[in-house]
Regions:
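Phosphate-backbone binding interfaces of nucleic-acid-interacting proteins
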Residues: 1-160
């Protein structure tokens, strides 16, 4: 059985306990924590909520778009994106330069003659679901620049 620490913390206050003490107490009072602890979201950093402010079709590609995104840092960032669902006003998950998604570190990259200074992400790329049909579509509830782990509560420890 897998249990989310975020879910358990809705019922129990863990303030001041480190992971080792928490595992010990959980094993004594509830159930043994078996083989491993999975750190959901631990391989994700620098990914934030961003809003697409402009979209232009790439002059030499039918699939690529040239975007300007607002990642909440006071400037617009140029991004090259091939997702079919890009549109002005869409809020999405955005990996800034320096962000890490698993083993991938985001760097400025030249794509079809244009520099992309980040990456708009699908749900699959950030580990929320297997959906890779387009970039994430996020509600307007979150301010630009909000850490995606905070917005989607994916910074979690899963006990087995």
């Amino acid at each position: 059985m897998f249990l989310s620490m975020n879910w358990i913390s809705d019922f129990v206050d863990f303030t001041g306990l480190d992971k080792v003490e928490l595992i010990h107490r959980f094993s004594l009072s509830t159930a043994e924590v078996e083989n491993e602890i999975l750190f959901k979201g631990s391989d994700l950093s620098g990914v934030v909520v961003a809003e697409i402010m402009s979209v232009e079709n790439h002059p030499d590609s039918k699939k690529l778009h040239l975007l300007k995104v607002d990642a909440g840092d006071g400037q617009l960032t140029d991004v090259v994106c091939g997702a079919p669902n890009v549109r002005v006003g869409l809020k999405t998950a955005f990996a800034k330069v320096g962000a890490k998604i698993g083993e991938l570190e985001i760097t400025p990259r030249k794509l079809a003659g244009y520099t992309s200074n980040g990456m708009c992400c699908s749900e699959k790329e950030i580990g929320i679901s297997e959906d890779n049909s387009g970039i994430m579509e996020i509600t307007d509830d979150f301010a630009n620049g909000t850490d995606i782990k905070e917005a989607y509560q994916i910074d979690d420890i899963i006990f087995e």
